Design a protein with these regions (language model features):
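Function-determining sites in protein domains
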Residues: 26-130
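Bacterial N-terminal signal peptides that target proteins for export
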Residues: 2-12
Length: 130
């Protein structure tokens, strides 16, 4: 009888410890930067510490490369809803200059006016990091 009483609390304790240990393994969501392009906004996930710091520097007004440039993933909004596309976070870089073919408004990506596989809005300004 004593063995059963002891097993039950030990089993419960083991289950609680396992749950606590596993919850520590769950990764935190990456920050998401919101950019304003004229009167439209779009969002990009920041997946590396370097990109996160660069975005914070931009938000603070530092003089760093400011044009977000990345590969467009169509038919998947990701963090960029309500748009039907997002920027592949693994391809994101910030540039001082880019070619004109990837410049434009987020709505131009949406409607296919921007035909490049990359999006690099020259007038983009970071407005928040969440």
């Amino acid at each position: 009888m004593h063995g059963r009483r002891l097993r039950m609390p030990l089993a419960a304790a083991a289950a609680i410890l396992a749950a606590v240990s596993l919850s520590g393994c769950i990764s935190q969501k990456n920050p998401v930067a919101t950019f304003q392009v004229v009167d439209e906004t779009y969002k990009i996930e920041l997946t590396t510490p370097e990109l996160q710091q660069h975005a914070r520097d931009l938000l603070a007004g530092e003089d760093v490369a400011s044009i977000p440039n990345g590969v467009v993933v169509r038919d998947d909004p990701g963090v960029n809803a309500p748009w039907s596309w997002h920027i592949d976070p693994a391809s994101l870089e910030f540039a001082d200059n880019t070619i004109e073919v990837c410049d434009g408004l987020p709505s131009y990506v949406e409607d296919g006016t921007v035909t490049s596989d990359r999006y690099c809005p020259w007038s983009a300004e970071i407005v928040s990091i969440d």
